[in-house]
C-alpha cells in the first residue's frame, strides 16, 4: 500500500468515527447533452443538466456556478444560479440551455426549471464535462458524458 493511499484511508476512517460529513451533497445527476434530431434553436431547452440534493439539509445555490468543460482551465460557458434558488432534500434543479421563465414545481420530488437564456447550444454532442462550483469557487461535483458511436 502506498503512503498516499494509506493516508487517504486513515482520513476516511477518521471521518466515519467522528461522523464528519461533507458540506454539500449536491450532485450533477444527468446531462442531456445531445437531444434527438438536428441541433436547431427550438430544441435549446431539450438540452439540460439535472442537479439533485442527496443530503438532508436545504442548500442555497445562490451564487453557485455551472460550467462546461474546464479541462483547459478556461470556463467557456458559465451559468450563475439566482439568489432565490435552494434545494431541499431530494429536490432537483433542471438547468435548460435556452430561454424561458424560471419556475418551481411542487411534487415528489419537487424541482426547479431554470433557464440559461442562451441562444446556442452549450454541451458538445460528442460529450462534455459539467462542473458545479459553490459561491466561493470550490468544486462541488463534476460529471463527464461521452457519446459512443456504433461501429
What are the language-model segments listed below?
Residues 35, 73, 85, 100, ...:
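Residue-level detector of flexible, active-site-proximal loop/helix-junction positions
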Residues 55-89:
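The feature marks short-to-medium sequence segments in extracytoplasmic or secretory-pathway proteins
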Residues 76-116:
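Intrinsically disordered, low-complexity Pro/Gly/Ser/Thr-rich segments with frequent PxxP/GP/PP motifs
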Amino acid at each position: 500500500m502506498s503512503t498516499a493511499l494509506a493516508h487517504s484511508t486513515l482520513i476516511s476512517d477518521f471521518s466515519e468515527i467522528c461522523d464528519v460529513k461533507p458540506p454539500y451533497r449536491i450532485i450533477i445527476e444527468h446531462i442531456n447533452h445531445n437531444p434527438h434530431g438536428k441541433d436547431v434553436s427550438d430544441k435549446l431547452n431539450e438540452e439540460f443538466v439535472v442537479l439533485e440534493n442527496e443530503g438532508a439539509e436545504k442548500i442555497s445555490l445562490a451564487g453557485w456556478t455551472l460550467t462546461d468543460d474546464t479541462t483547459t482551465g478556461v470556463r467557456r460557458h458559465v451559468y450563475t444560479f439566482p439568489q432565490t434558488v435552494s434545494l431541499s432534500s431530494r429536490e432537483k434543479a433542471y438547468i435548460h440551455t435556452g430561454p424561458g421563465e424560471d419556475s418551481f414545481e411542487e411534487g415528489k420530488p419537487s424541482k426547479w426549471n431554470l433557464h440559461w437564456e442562451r441562444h446556442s447550444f452549450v454541451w458538445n454532442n460528442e460529450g462534455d464535462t459539467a462542473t458545479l462550483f459553490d459561491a466561493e469557487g470550490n468544486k462541488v461535483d463534476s460529471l463527464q458524458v461521452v457519446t459512443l458511436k456504433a461501429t
